[in-house]
Amino acid sequence: MKTESTNIIGKADGPTSYFVLSRDQKLTLKQRIQKTRFQLKKKWIEKHIAAEGHTMDEVCKYVQERYGFREVSGKSAGIQYEYEEMRTSFMITHAPELLGEYAKHPELKGHSEEEIREFMAQVEDRKEVARNVPKDKFDIDFHKYEKKMGDTQMHIIIEKKYDYIGGGASGKKTIKEFDKVFKDVYRYYGVTKEDIVNRTKRYDMMVRTLARR
């Protein structure tokens, strides 16, 4: 089985996953150490960050010219599925008013199996309503870039309208290489002086991305 890594970064909230955790769950010693290292690295990055931002169009050009990624045809079934899933997720985040009675995010009332099943069913119903909203009411500017290396691959997804960058890779060695590439791409995307002054989401996501292992 191939090892796979996925990174999801962006100025705006992207594809949404739901995790139900126990309230009394505690961090392990290893997790506490990792958290401390992350916080220290985050502070160092914040101290040295510079205003060198680029546009999404420039980022698209950068991943192709610097790393040899190629854009995947938007006509393929796989790309159409990914596009629809992202459009649904972004609509729920940025235009919930289009969902009518499903505009409000469902609430998890408790942690019993029945309550969790009910919550997940409501989440799926909401997504289905979003899928049926016409594209002329809400749409995204989705692009996927891929680089294949034998039986492994890495890919970067860029959504220009909401300034989203994400991606992933398969294969242990490829994952390590991808992490370096992804951080460099996000570093190139960068931040503006306004982002630094106002501590925008773009600023926060860049710091968090670069602070990861």
Residue ranges and their predicted role:
Residues 34-213:
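Conserved mixed alpha/beta catalytic, RNA-binding, or beta-rich assembly cores of soluble enzyme
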Residues 2-29, 35:
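Amphipathic alpha-helical packing elements
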